[in-house]
């Protein structure tokens, strides 16, 4: 009662980090599996929805190690793509989200999580490419330590932008608020 009491009888949850599979896929392989094929994204979204989820969070920015140049693999410690995308990386990421949208239809909300891996121009290009898929929000497409970079992305793509887990003080958020760059914190 002191802090206002209960305000919501229910809270919405989303199925998170589907790029690592979902229950049926994990049980089948007995481990987390990083998904590369868009068909697998279709399947895991269907599985999550069968469990009652109407929103999912996906990071589509991964590539098999054998496709990464060795210098890039050493610099990124694995499958994550950092910085600039090659054209086929962009296409593959969009295909994964397209498969999720196809699986979920218009009633599914899709959150695209990038874990701050991309540079500003690549994040803007990917955001533009994802616009037709009705993305709920585009989370941390690049590092939030320079709010001007988020402003650059916001000016170039129409997706709602989100950040917050890597900004820690009111000063870390101040410029975002002043520029009205963020849609979700």
Predicted regions and their residues:
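Short, structured coil segments at secondary-structure junctions
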Residues: 156-157, 180-181
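Catalytic cores of alpha/beta
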Residues: 118-128, 148, 168-180
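A ubiquitous, low-specificity "background" feature that marks scattered single residues
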Residues: 65, 145-146
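Active-site alpha/beta core segments
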Residues: 151, 157-159
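Active-site phosphate/pyrophosphate- and oxyanion-stabilizing loops and adjacent acidic/basic residues
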Residues: 98, 151, 174
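N-terminal capping/lid subdomain adjacent to the active-site entrance of alpha/beta enzymes
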Residues: 1-109, 117, 124, 128-132, ...
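Catalytic beta/alpha-barrel core
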Residues: 57-59, 84-90, 111-116, 134-144, ...
């Amino acid at each position: 009662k002191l802090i206002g009491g209960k305000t919501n009888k229910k809270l919405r949850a989303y199925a998170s980090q589907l790029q690592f599979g979902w229950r049926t896929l994990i049980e089948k392989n007995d481990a987390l599996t990083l998904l590369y094929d868009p068909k697998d994204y279709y399947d895991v979204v269907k599985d999550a929805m069968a469990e009652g989820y109407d929103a999912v969070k996906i990071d589509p920015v991964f590539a098999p190690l054998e496709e990464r140049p060795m210098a890039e693999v050493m610099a990124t410690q694995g499958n994550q793509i950092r910085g600039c995308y090659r054209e086929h990386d962009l296409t593959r990421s969009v295909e994964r989200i397209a498969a999720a949208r196809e699986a979920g239809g218009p009633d599914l909300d899709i959150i695209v999580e990038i874990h701050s891996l991309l540079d500003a121009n690549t994040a803007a290009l990917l955001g533009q490419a994802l616009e037709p898929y009705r993305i709920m929000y585009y989370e941390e497409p690049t590092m939030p330590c320079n709010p001007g970079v988020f402003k650059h992305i916001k000016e170039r793509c129409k997706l709602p932008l989100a950040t917050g887990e890597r900004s820690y003080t009111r000063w870390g958020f101040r410029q975002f608020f002043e520029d009205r760059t963020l849609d979700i914190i």
